[in-house]
Amino acid sequence: MSLRLSSGSRRSYARPSTGSLRGASFGAGNACGVAGIGSGFSCAFGGSSTGGNTGVANSCAGFTVNEGGLLSGNEKVTMQNLNDRLASYLDNVQALQEANADLEQKIKGWYEKFGPGSCRGLDHDYSRYFPIIDDLKNQIITSTTSNANAVLQIDNARLTADDFRLKYENELALHQSVEADVNGLRRVLDEITLCRTDLEIQYETLSEELTYLKKNHKEEMQALQCAAGGNVNVEMNAAPGVDLTVLLNNMRAEYEALAEQNRRDAEAWFQEKSASLQQQITEDVGATTSARNELTEMKRTLQTLEIELQSLLATKHSLECSLTETEGNYCTQLAQIQAQISALEEQLHQVRTETEGQKLEYEQLLNVKAHLEKEIETYCLLIGGDEGACKSSSYKSKDYGSGNAGNQIKDPVKAIVVKKVLEEVDQRSKILTTRLHSLEEKSQSN
């Protein structure tokens, strides 16, 4: 919201006279010239104003009076009149200073009420961003909590995977030991198979030898029978010899008994070894079957654990990707919000700078306006009376309105009416309120 002050109309009433106002210009260090009937008058005014106080310094550069001019007659009365007018001028200056101080106080109060610290007036209202910021903070907290839960789940899954890995290593060591035992039993089985093959070969060899002995014995018996059944009769008186038949029969009986004993011993040893080997093979087959079943179950468990591990790794990867994406999105949003805040702060700084510039320009224009009004009033007071009429000029201000001046002739009493219009406008140059202040001063002309 900006404050604009436009000066109203300033009117002066005086009796008609033969004096005229020509070539008057007003400003800091302005010079005015008045030509009257039978008199010459020239005066220069200089004024300045700084800050909130208005100071006016008027210096008369030249004051020339002809014999039939303004100061002809009683010079003492004229000086008294000028002193009275100067006192009135100083009173007006004091009143304007008080009005200026009042305006400064109002401007200060307005800045305290609508200044940058109150989030109103010229300052931007950031209250509509607070819910968005709170929502973003809540989302960040929720995402952080979800991230912490995901990290906790990942740690639990990692610990579970480590536990399963230890179990797998233990089962693998047990499996390797069982395989080593199976390999040892296989070597024992191979040795037993070799021993059985050797025994079978020995049995076959002994069987062939027995068959060969039976065949030789049969041939010898046939030869002896053929020799005994011939027609040759030989009689001789000799000592009785050894009966070969009996001897052969005895040898055959001993040999058969020995072969039968060897066969029985070999068969008994073979049966014993076969029974022990069969029992050991049965036990080994049972252990192998149980080990194979256990190995199958361990493989199934390992596959299940690998599947669970892969699913957990996939979940972890997806959560990490989601976390990265969420962080990127929130970083982008925070960067955008920071950019908006920076832009708004820059706009706020620019608005404050413009406001300060407008304030300084307003003060300067107000000081110039006050100075011009004082010069006009002083000029009117100096040239007032019976010699001439005051004619004020009109001027325009770019930011604070315009003032109109004119003179009217009503009666011998001179009246000065000062009207001030105080307008409050917003940033869109829309007039909100308008206040009118008028100050009327009447004085009897000389």
From Swiss-Prot:
Modified residues (Phosphoserine): 438
Region ranges (Linker 12): 225-247
Annotated effect of mutating residue 379 to N: In Rex mutant M100573; mice exhibit curly hair and vibrissae. The diameter of the hair shaft is irregular due to morphological abnormalities in all three layers of the irs
Annotated spans, Tail: 387-446
Compartmental location: Cytoplasm
Molecular functions per Gene Ontology: protein heterodimerization activity; structural molecule activity
Limits of the IF rod domain: 75-390
Entry keyword set: Coiled coil, Cytoplasm, Intermediate filament, Keratin, Phosphoprotein
GO cellular component, one term: keratin filament
PROSITE patterns per record: IF_ROD_2 (PS51842)
Region (Coil 2): 248-386
Protein name (record): Keratin, type I cytoskeletal 25
The organism of origin for this protein: Mus musculus
